[in-house]
């Protein structure tokens, strides 16, 4: 067993393009995206699998991919978590509202946007079923570290020095069993949802 929990770890645009890191789990619709630059190298299916997006700052090469993220998820019945520095809520809302929508009944996407600040976080829900009304912002205390976690990992965020408000993120896997995806792909069994179910049972 190797300490690699993901079926896909992709530096989407290489080392010289817009910063985008895509992390995917085998057989689950809960991928993570670190930074929101140009993401045309990802398929709409990959973007539709996203559970959380982590924006470092709002320069164009870190934020321009938001439109495509929304396009891939607008027809889904899910909550997409999006994290970023100060003013992220308003900037995301303005981008979403710059388009017209048919608001079909099956379009049930909710974008939960969280701004991470010193000692506090602000959260707002942008809901398609309510036709994306102006966000109602809720403020909570925050210890300045863990901003997101699930059964497999947790993500920490810290403010860093830049010309604009900016965050750096660190991801840490939880202890447990992590399959070697290369060996799995070369065997008789194929990756799928059963992998996550097996890991869940092993962790109990």
Feature-to-residue mapping (PLM):
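Conserved beta-strand hairpin/beta-sheet module of binuclear metal-dependent hydrolase folds
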Residues: 1-46, 52, 168-171, 177
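Divalent metal-coordination and catalytic microenvironments
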Residues: 34, 57, 82, 155, ...
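Active-site metal-binding motif and surrounding structural segment of the metallo-beta-lactamase
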Residues: 38-84, 103
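Hydrophobic packing residues within well-ordered alpha-helices of enzyme cores
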Residues: 66-69, 92-96
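Short beta-alpha junction loops
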Residues: 86-89, 117-119
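A glycine-rich helix N-cap at a beta->alpha junction
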Residues: 100-119
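Metal-dependent phosphodiesterase/nuclease catalytic metal-binding core
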Residues: 137-204
């Amino acid at each position: 067993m190797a300490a690699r929990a993901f079926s896909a770890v992709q530096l989407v645009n290489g080392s010289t393009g817009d910063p985008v890191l895509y992390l995917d789990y085998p057989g689950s619709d809960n991928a993570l995206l670190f930074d929101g630059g140009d993401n045309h190298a990802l398929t709409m299916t990959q973007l539709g699998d996203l559970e959380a997006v982590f924006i470092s700052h709002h320069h164009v090469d870190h934020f321009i991919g938001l439109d495509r993220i929304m396009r891939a998820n607008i027809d889904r019945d899910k909550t997409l978590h999006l994290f970023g520095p100060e003013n992220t809520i308003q900037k995301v809302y303005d981008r979403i509202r710059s388009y017209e929508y048919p608001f079909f009944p099956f379009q049930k996407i909710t974008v939960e946007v969280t701004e991470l600040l010193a000692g506090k976080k602000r959260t707002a829900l942008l809901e398609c079923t309510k036709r994306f009304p102006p966000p109602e912002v809720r403020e909570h205390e925050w210890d300045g570290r863990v901003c997101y976690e699930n059964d497999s990992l947790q993500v920490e965020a810290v403010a860093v020095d830049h010309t604009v408000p900016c965050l750096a993120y660190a991801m840490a896997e939880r202890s447990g069993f992590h399959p070697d995806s290369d060996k799995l792909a070369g065997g008789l069994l194929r990756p799928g949802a059963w992998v996550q179910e097996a890991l869940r049972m092993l962790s109990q």
